[in-house]
Amino acid sequence: ARRKIVVSSLGPFPLQLRPADNQQAVDTMISHWKRELEQVLPDRPDLIVLPEACDRYPAMNKEERLSYYRFRGDKIRDFFRDVARRNRCYIAYSAAREMPDGTWRNSTLLIDRNGEIAGIYNKNYPTVGEVTEWKTLAGKEAPVFQTDFGRVGMAICFDLNFHELLERYAKQRPDLIIFSSMYHGGLMQGYGAYHCRSYFVGAIAGPENNILNPLGARVACSTNYLPRVTAAINLDYQVVHLDENWEKLEAVKKKYGRGVTVFDPGFVG
C-alpha cells in the first residue's frame, strides 16, 4: 500500500438556489461540483472528501426536496464515479439515500479509483429532525474500508459527539477518518483524531476544513477566502509515549535523518 498520499477537502457553502425544475436542479448541482473539483484536481489528490448532504438545496421545502431527490436518484453519484475513474482518485460522496422500504439514510459513499463503490457508511447518530421529519434511520455499523493506501473509517456531522462511535473505530485502528459534515465539531475533531490515532480529513459546508494528524494537530486548513484544502500526509506513522522511548526516538532519528519526522504536539507526553 502506498503510504504517502495527497488528500483534498472541499467545503463550499451549499447552493442557495431554487431551480425551476428537477432537471435544472441536477444539472446545476453537477456544474457546481465540477467547478469545485477543478480547483483541486491539478494537485492529483488520492482522496477528495465532500461535505455532508453535498447535493442538497437548503432553500427547497420538504415536498420539493423529496421530488428532487427521487429524480436525482444516482445521477449525481454517477457523476462523481466518473470523476473518480477519470482522475484515478478516491472520492467520499455524502448524500441522502432513499431505501426500497421508503426510509432514508444519511450516507457517505467511498468511491474508488475505478469509479466503483468501495464502501458505504450510514450516519449512526442522525439528529432528531432527520428521524422525525425525514424518516432517516440510524446506521448500526462502524465499518473500516481497505483502500490501496490504508484503512479508512467515516463519520457524519452529529456522529462526532458520540464517544461510542469513536471507540468502535479506535478498536479497528484505521489510518484515516473521513468526516463529512454541516457542523464543524470544534475540539471534537482533534479529540476524534487522537482517540482513534488516525489522520482526520474534515469537509464542512462553510466553516474551515481541517486535515489533522493522529495526535489531533493541524496539518492544513481552508480559509475564509478559499473553501478547500489539499495536503500531503504520510500514513507510515506510529503514535508512541515519550517515556520509555526517548532513546529509541533519538536512535531512529540518528539512523534515518530527514527520512523520519519526530513530532511532539506538547503537553500530552
Roles of regions detected by a PLM:
Residues 99-172, 187-191, 195:
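Active-site catalytic loop in hydrolytic enzyme cores
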Residues 24-114, 195:
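Cys-nucleophile CN-hydrolase/nitrilase-fold catalytic domain and related Cys-dependent amidase chemistry
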Residues 2-23, 107, 120-122, 151-159, ...:
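Active-site-proximal beta-strand elements of phosphoester/diester hydrolases
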Residues 13-15, 54-57, 97-100, 127, ...:
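Solvent-exposed loop/turn segments at secondary-structure junctions
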Residues 6, 43-44, 88, 151, ...:
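Short loop/turn motifs at secondary-structure junctions
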Residues 72-91, 160-267:
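CN hydrolase (nitrilase-like) catalytic-core segments centered on the catalytic cysteine
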